[in-house]
Amino acid sequence: MLLFGFLLLTFALVSQRQGAEAESNLSSKFQFSSAKEQNGVQEPQHEKIITVSANGSIHSPKFPYTYPRNTVLVWRLVAIEENVLIQLTFDERFGLEDPEDDICKYDFVEVEEPSDGSILGRWCGSTAVPGKQISKGNQIRIRFVSDEYFPSEPGFCIHYTLLTPHQTESASPTVLPPSAFSLDLLNNAVAGFSTVEELIRYLEPDRWQLDLEDLYKPAWQLLGKAYIHGRKSRVVDLNLLKEEVRMYSCTPRNFSVSLREELKRTDTIFWPLCLLVKRCGGNCACCQHSCSECQCIPTKVTKKYHEVLQLKPRSGVRGLHKSLTDVPLEHHEECECVCKGNAEG
């Protein structure tokens, strides 16, 4: 009887322990699943702290070859001396997965200011190398993320150097806020930005990422008509020479036009400031008409729409209203040499 009771007690203890282990395993699995981001990348529990006393570099895994998928790496650079700053310079060999709608959503490298949590920049793609970044204090954080799709090469390599405050002042001129400019001066300042991301970050440093995402929410887009220039058949060399004269003497060619001047909109800033259009150009030295002087004029004109960023002052409210808009521009598709006095005849 005692033996039977001992066996029952042992069985109960074993069952209770197995149940606790199963519950623990289920809890761990749930925590692991909830720790994943929506794109399937698991966030790291700890960042790698690098004590900086001299120049050095960090890079994506396997640089300059294809980096691995499903990766999140965070480095925090901390200078030993508190009165120095850290400057980051990207290697010319830069390439991550391309952005979607000019927004780096999937694979990207991001630089953050640890003192206030502000994002200094997020980059991806391979069309341009990111510019230099300078910390506000003696620390700076770098974050690299890749999702489970489309890894690229060569990744990135960032060289870091130490700067004293007076070096920073001489190297980086003061950038005035948008509110310090009139509309015409702000138009000139906007011309210096090479990407929409840099422009929005300048206009709205505290909420530029939200503004950039809001900017691309509309799904509609007006497309201009496509135009194709036909080619003539070329039989012999003389025909070729004559055809080249015809093609390049008075033909549609690329011209850059200022949107504010072209649209006569001095109350608005457009970005990009200028666009390429087809306009008639060239000379008419071999004009076939019997007149003293010929000129090149368009004989077929079409209107095409181009989507650009529009910045307009808000009435009674500080800041600029930002929106994507379609602007109509004239394109010359066919040109002809005519007598100057008969241009309108």
UniProtKB/Swiss-Prot annotation:
This is Platelet-derived growth factor C. The keyword Signal applies. Glycans are attached at N25, N55. Growth factor that plays an essential role in the regulation of embryonic development, cell proliferation, cell migration, survival and chemotaxis. Potent mitogen and chemoattractant for cells of mesenchymal origin. Required for normal skeleton formation during embryonic development. Required for normal skin morphogenesis during embryonic development. Plays an important role in wound healing, in angiogenesis and blood vessel development. Proteolytic removal of the N-terminal CUB domain releasing the core domain is necessary for unmasking the receptor-binding epitopes of the core domain. Cleavage after basic residues in the hinge region (region connecting the CUB and growth factor domains) gives rise to the receptor-binding form. Homodimer; disulfide-linked. Interacts with PDGFRA homodimers, and with heterodimers formed by PDGFRA and PDGFRB. Keywords: Cleavage on pair of basic residues, Developmental protein, Disulfide bond, Glycoprotein, Growth factor, Mitogen, Secreted, Signal. Residues 46-163 form the CUB domain. Belongs to the PDGF/VEGF growth factor family. One of its GO terms (cellular component) is extracellular space. PROSITE patterns: CUB (PS01180), PDGF_2 (PS50278). It comes from Gekko japonicus. It is found in: Secreted. It comes from the Eukaryota. One of its GO terms (biological process) is platelet-derived growth factor receptor signaling pathway. The record marks K225, A226, R231, K232, R234, V235 as: Cleavage. One of its GO terms (molecular function) is platelet-derived growth factor receptor binding. Residues 1-22 form the signal peptide. The keyword tRNA processing does not apply. Pfam families: CUB (PF00431), PDGF (PF00341).
